Amino acid sequence: MTSAVITSETKPWYLNRWSQLVLALIAMMSISSPQYVWTLFTGPLNAKLGTTLAELQWTFSLLIILQTWCSPLQAYLVDRFGPRLLISIGALMSGGGWVLSSYVDNVWALYLTYGVICGFGTGIIYVGLIGLMVRWFPDRRGLATGLAAAGYGFGAIFTSFPIDSMIKSSGYAHTLVVWGFIQGIIGILAAQGLRTPPDGWLPAGYSPAAASTAQAKRSYTPREMLQSPVFWLLFVMMSMMATSGLMVVSNVGPFANEYKVGQALVLGMAALPLSLTLSRLTNGLTRPFFGWVSDHIGREATMALAFSLECVAILILFAFIDRPALFVVLTGLVFFGWGEIFSLFPATLTDTFGSTYAATNYGFLYIAQGVGSILGGPAAAYLHQNTGSWTAVFIVVAFLDALTALLAITALRSMRQKHFAKG
């Protein structure tokens, strides 16, 4: 791989970086269903396998664990063997895991097919594509990673209703086979055009020295990155934001039920499903939006702005949570202040440690999402169980948001400036 700086767009068409972004978006959308429509399969799977819901939900936990805690290995494989091959393998595992899940007759087999195989496959695609986008877009890292990450959430918007309809008309097993083939084929086809830009590649007219966001003068290996205090501060900050967000994400339904707003009508729809739909939309839109903002005003300032927005939104939500219309609007605003972590943190990481090992380096940082998935839901449940109300949960979420915003404009900004000064 050459280290020469290339200052013109690479041809053929599929090596144009905007084509790469479109292909990444398609591949991301193809893997969103295993996570976001899992809840549609729990009822029929529970009836078929004769297991408890708690045992069945370990499938979902394994899916998330394999997506996040294995991300350094998944990202290393993408860096080592290239995105075309590995994204194809990831799509094959994701789609194949669904097809195999249609044949299982016990929960342990489901753990393997849906949890392990699907989880590892979707993890390869997610961290691999984020790592690829930060390399193709050194001048628009926030926007590019935001758009790619948004695809992961938006894909389920197009699949939820047809999958739900097919389960009701044809059964869950037939649905898993059909949609397993669909998502696998789409992902494999999109992967065929994916390529890594040459080391040192730059878009025409772009100069790192003139960029509005500070850039590393060289690329750091994963070993070097793990020895840097800046990485560990980013890891702690992302863990705190992932935890705070997932404390809310996992409990929107219980919030609505306890405060008796879930079935109240807002614009002719029940407040709970309307709030979930709006939240999914805002959770996707915030990723490219704040990514784009960070490309212009800087990463730390954007983090402080977005995290403060979630802090304020969660406090206002707590104050007016028993009002259905405000419940819908404010839950959407909370998600708008949270989802951008999936664009701001990878962009900041690559700015700081360079692009050559971008996928592998982000794989280590993405473990923070796994930390949040383990801590967020259980921590919220523990606080509610031991205090008898959701007050403590809202206070903890607001505190984590405010603390992370403060760290962004104080410790992170100062430490990154010293890091860049050392070269």
Predicted features along the sequence, with ranges:
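Hydrophobic core of transmembrane alpha-helices in multi-pass small-molecule transporters
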Residues: 29, 97, 109-124, 239, ...
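Extracytoplasmic gate region of multi-pass secondary transporters
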Residues: 38-42, 223-290
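Interfacial helix-cap and linker-helix signal at transmembrane-aqueous boundaries
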Residues: 45-46, 77-78, 158-170, 256-257, ...
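Conserved MFS/SLC helix-loop-helix module at the cytosolic interface between two early adjacent transmembrane helices
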Residues: 69-107, 294-300
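Intracellular juxtamembrane helix-capping segments at the cytosolic ends
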Residues: 123-137, 145, 340-353
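Helix-loop-helix hairpin linking two adjacent transmembrane segments in secondary transporters
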Residues: 152-199
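C-terminal transmembrane helical hairpin of 12-TM major facilitator-type secondary transporters
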Residues: 271-282, 288-348
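A late C-terminal transmembrane helix in Major Facilitator Superfamily
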Residues: 352-387
